[in-house]
Amino acid sequence: MSPYLLPLCAPLLLLGAAAFGFMRKGRRPPLVPVCAEAAALGGLLVALASLAVLILRGPGASGLIGWAGIGLSVRLDAVSVTMLLLVTFIGWIVVRYARTYLDGEARQGYFIGWLCTALAAVLLLVQAGNVVQLVAAWVATSAALHRLLLFYPDRRAAQRAARKKRLFSSISAAALLTAIGLIWVSFGTTDIATINAQARTGEGSWLIVTAAAMLALAAILKSAQFPTHGWLTEVMEAPTPVSALLHAGVINAGGFLLIRFADLMVSAPGVLAVLAMLGGFTALFGALVMLTQPAVKTSLAWSTVAQMGFMTLQCGLALFPLALLHIVAHSLYKAHAFLASGGAVEQVASIRRPGPVAVPNGLAVVRAFLIALAIYAGIGAAFGFTFGFEHKSPQALALGTILIFGVAYLLAQGLADAAPHPLTRRTAIYASAAAIGYFALQTAAEWLTAGVLPATPAPGRLEWTLMALAVLSFGAAAVAQALFPLWASHPAAAGLRVHLSNGLYVNATIDRVLGGWSVPKAS
């Protein structure tokens, strides 16, 4: 048996646990939680063993278990192993958490069954070696998530969110099927590695560009990009383990799809430009709305909208290694944030503050941004001299500039007149650490995915325009946020806050346009 088939053991273990859960659906089913946790841990061990296979034997693909290009196959490379490790680790944590969280629920076994099914489907998706398996896993993931979102079927908000999610997922699946059909016509194969290899060496025909557009549409709908983001902010009625799995795992499927077909996407620069524009706007929109949310979970949901937008922006700029790194970092953070959300208020209240709240004036904000940019430029030059400037694409430098704007906001707090010296020193250290971390992680991600993901192409006039627009937009938003305390008491600020807290009513408008989202009251 090929060692590259080893990753298939992980979803098989979870499917076995799921079947056991469905057989014992009730309250406190004997051995079901234990078996589910053991299967999730076993999946993590399989992922670690798959990493060992990759290190010892290099990237490769298994043979097809099936016929005529239809069946199961595994693509083992840096992308799939990274996602395998991420999904199995978070899955194990979520299953372990759910064991206590749902203890005593009337349908505990039913929930565990669908939770394990969802994890198995995601694992089949990220290791798929052929497009048929990828589409089947894509659809199965959506179906399992729908069941989890309706775990409390009598909750009207849960019904509305699940119905809206199912609509966008169905359109996404249709777009993906269309893309796969065009890909098969263009390349005559269902093997993903062969498709990417041919896309890397061929020219972008209209069929390939159309396929890339359909892949982009599928990813946009799956990752809740503006204006289809509303359902993601409405799923708070589901149990916390579902929120953690959704926001830290399933929502990343759109980004993974773009990364997996990166070679094909690069051949359609116009499609990438649309992704960059939509992703950048979604990131800005989600971040601004997030700042106005009063509840922990809704704030985290809007944070996910913003992060998925930023990930889409990275894919649109052809920074696929950084997009993969973003998926890993965001998933780990967001899983912890949701599972720990119950104690968030107490944690914030217990934080020791070194002094009074520092409100920077305009001069402090300008100084902070200039210092942050100087730190970024200095550390970037140091990395360039060490590892070579040819590895620093303009797109990556522009993205790092956006990152440093967030650090500049913190630095402005440290430069305020009322800021104590420990705060000033700490924010300066944070700025330097963020710049070093960005360049180090970017270098590591590009090195690990070399030969698997395409290099970022040289930007043209359109790409330069998009980068300038993104940097200016995020810079203006960061400056406005830093200066907000100076005009927070103005009546216009209060009105703006109300409108932003309602997401500028975009979701309500979409509901009205689509219609049919009212859920009848229970009789």
Task: Describe each PLM feature range.
Residues 1-494, 498-523:
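...captures the hydrophobic TM-helix bundle architecture rather than a specific catalytic motif
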